């Protein structure tokens, strides 16, 4: 189904690569600086947190913590002593972004999407292309996995009996059944529309962010747009 994207907030950062609504706050992961920007419901930044994340991508909130996807070697800032150049799932202080704990990704590689779900974490993977559900209270043990056929899994958003996953290169968002992994629904962006990176849901409405990765030397063939974007999806 084709959709309309509605730019809603000015992006607070150059590369808004992850989004998470939590209560009345929108958490934005900046892949360039690896800072997290927290915006209120009117779109104004209320605080900015430094994090140990490297090449930050997905973000979620749950269990009283902030969780970030550390996607390996950074390409957009100077190296820091905390950088390891490999993929991690970070557990951070919700108010300050300070380190609490971390775990390697299920496949040992990069990571784009995270979503909290009643004490568990949904996690995207690339080797193979899959979505895992993990237990952060049992050493990030993988509980279930379903493989998906589409490339470049990105933001995640839990919705009813399914989970939406942005597939950025294809400019689609697919809803997968959380029990079987079968496709339930599909949202198709137009050719000139944003490339969905971050994804979250608020009051039944999907929100997206486009980090505009074209021309930054990472090999992604995303639409060449004027700048980063945060908005809503209407159907």
Report residues per predicted region.
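A short loop-to-beta-strand structural motif that recurs across blades of beta-propeller domains
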Residues: 35-37, 87-90, 130-132, 172-174, ...
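Solenoidal tandem-repeat scaffolds enriched in leucines and small polar residues
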Residues: 123-124, 131-148, 154-156, 165
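Conserved beta-strand positions in repeat-built beta-propeller and related beta-rich domains
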Residues: 12, 28-33, 68-83, 123-128, ...
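Blade-level signature of beta-propeller repeat domains, shared across WD40, Kelch, NHL, RCC1
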Residues: 197-235
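Beta-propeller domains
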Residues: 30-43
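A short beta-strand motif characteristic of beta-propeller blades
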Residues: 4-10, 44-49, 98-104, 140-147, ...
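Beta-rich, blade/repeat-based domains predominating
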Residues: 9-23, 52-64, 69-74, 105-118, ...
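Short loop/turn segments that connect beta-strands within beta-propeller blades
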Residues: 40-44, 93-97, 135-139, 177-181, ...
């Amino acid at each position: 189904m084709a959709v309309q994207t509605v730019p809603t907030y000015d992006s607070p950062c150059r590369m808004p690569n992850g989004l998470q609504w939590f209560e009345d706050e929108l958490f934005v992961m900046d892949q360039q600086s690896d800072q997290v920007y927290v915006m209120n419901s009117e779109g104004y930044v209320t605080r900015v947190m430094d994090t140990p994340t490297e090449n930050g991508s997905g973000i979620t909130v749950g269990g009283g913590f902030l969780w970030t996807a550390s996607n390996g070697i950074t390409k957009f800032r100077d190296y820091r002593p905390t950088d390891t150049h490999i993929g991690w799932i970070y557990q951070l202080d919700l108010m300050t972004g300070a380190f609490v704990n971390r775990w390697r990704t299920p496949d040992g590689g990069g990571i784009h999407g995270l979503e909290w779900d009643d004490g568990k974490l949904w996690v995207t993977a690339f080797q193979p292309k899959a979505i895992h559900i993990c237990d952060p209270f049992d050493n990030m043990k993988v509980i279930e996995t379903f493989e998906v056929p589409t490339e470049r899994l990105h933001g995640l958003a839990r919705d009813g009996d399914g989970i939406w996953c942005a597939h950025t290169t294809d400019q689609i968002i697919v809803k997968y059944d959380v029990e079987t992994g079968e496709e339930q629904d599909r949202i198709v962006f137009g050719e000139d529309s944003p490339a969905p990176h971050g994804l979250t849901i608020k009051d039944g409405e999907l929100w997206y962010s486009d980090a505009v990765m074209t021309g930054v030397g990472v090999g992604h063939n995303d639409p060449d747009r004027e700048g980063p974007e945060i908005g809503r999806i209407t159907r």
